[in-house]
């Protein structure tokens, strides 16, 4: 038995959603078919309204319906620290922990060469002008292979800018995504973050060859 074309199309579109395979898409399609028409229209309206009203914050690239997101617009936030995350959902998860009062930067993904996701596909370039000498940057990407690779790439970019770079780690399972962690675990992960670099120190003053060999420097000739 073949499904009607409209049902096939619905299953196909649902299966394009993250985490939804063909079987789950089929179950969702049958579920939606059984719902009252007004419920389906309300769902469709909510999707269209969100698509119309939401956009990314021009500063941190979190999702907002205002000119700038709530965090970037809040003058009481700690301006000396930026927490870098993969997705907007990670911001919500960290905010629920109540352990962080700094700023954010959302990359909208992680480096994944196998899937064709390079640095140019992420919001990495806009992060660099935000980082000032002596600021702390918390790399709160996931503990997946892609998240670790992204953190290492960012560390190498940020160290020459004089940033104190730290990595969220404690309490997060390997391969875990931040948005699925509970508030207590995230709070401990933020509190237990470890520094992976320090601000670059200026090079020592150069000495002439004789001083370097241990011989006293010659007095200046007249």
Curated annotation (Swiss-Prot):
Domain Toprim: 80-173
Keywords, ordered alphabetically: DNA damage, DNA recombination, DNA repair, Metal-binding, Zinc, Zinc-finger
GO molecular function, one term: DNA binding
Stretches the record annotates as Disordered: 189-222
InterPro entries: DNA_Rcmb_RecR, Hlx-hairpin-Hlx_DNA-bd_motif, Rcmb_RecR, Rcmb_RecR_Znf, TOPRIM_dom, TOPRIM_RecR
Keyword Nucleotide-binding: no
Listed Pfam families: RecR_C, RecR_HhH, RecR_ZnF, Toprim_4
GO biological process: DNA recombination; DNA repair
Gene3D superfamilies assigned to the protein according to its UniProt record, in alphabetical order: 3.30.60.80, 3.40.1360.10, 6.10.250.240, RecR Domain 1
Superkingdom, natural source: Bacteria
TM regions (residue ranges): none
C4-type zinc-finger residues: 57-72
UniProt record similarity statement: Belongs to the RecR family.
General function of this protein: May play a role in DNA repair. It seems to be involved in an RecBC-independent recombinational process of DNA repair. It may act with RecF and RecO.
Entry-linked PANTHER family: RECOMBINATION PROTEIN RECR
Name assigned to this protein: Recombination protein RecR
Organism phylogeny: Bacteria, Thermotogati, Deinococcota, Deinococci, Deinococcales
